[in-house]
């Protein structure tokens, strides 16, 4: 059993992008920015508990940070982890209506 405190730390934010929006509309899949140490089981449990929906699958990937320049200095953005969460048919998560 995963502790409730850990579940609240797993999902950092929804990832809003053109690809994510199309995925949500066509394949009932939501995209989240998650903690780098989060496992698929933790992500599934967190989504089910926080949004009260049934999850059918979780796919994760590590996004590498881009190299960016500010004047003459060269910096690098942080790496982060992204999760594609598939929901059962008919389930939906409404981020706009969330408070």
From Swiss-Prot:
The keyword ATP-binding does not apply. InterPro entries: Nucleotide-bd_a/b_plait_sf, Ribosomal_uL23-like, Ribosomal_uL23/eL15/eS24_sf. It comes from the Bacteria. Keywords: Ribonucleoprotein, Ribosomal protein, RNA-binding, rRNA-binding. Pfam families: Ribosomal_L23. One of the early assembly proteins it binds 23S rRNA. One of the proteins that surrounds the polypeptide exit tunnel on the outside of the ribosome. Forms the main docking site for trigger factor binding to the ribosome. HAMAP family: Ribosomal_uL23_B. This is Large ribosomal subunit protein uL23. It comes from Psychromonas ingrahamii (strain DSM 17664 / CCUG 51855 / 37). The gene is rplW.
């Amino acid at each position: 059993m995963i502790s409730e405190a850990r579940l609240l730390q797993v999902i950092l934010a929804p990832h809003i992008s053109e690809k994510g929006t199309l995925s949500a509309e066509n394949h009932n899949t939501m995209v989240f920015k998650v903690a780098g140490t989060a496992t698929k089981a933790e992500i599934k449990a967190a989504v089910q508990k926080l949004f009260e929906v049934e999850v059918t699958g979780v796919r994760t990937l590590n996004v590498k940070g881009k190299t960016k320049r500010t004047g003459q200095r060269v910096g690098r953005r942080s790496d982060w982890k992204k999760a594609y969460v598939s929901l059962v048919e008919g389930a939906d998560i409404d981020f706009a209506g969330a408070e």
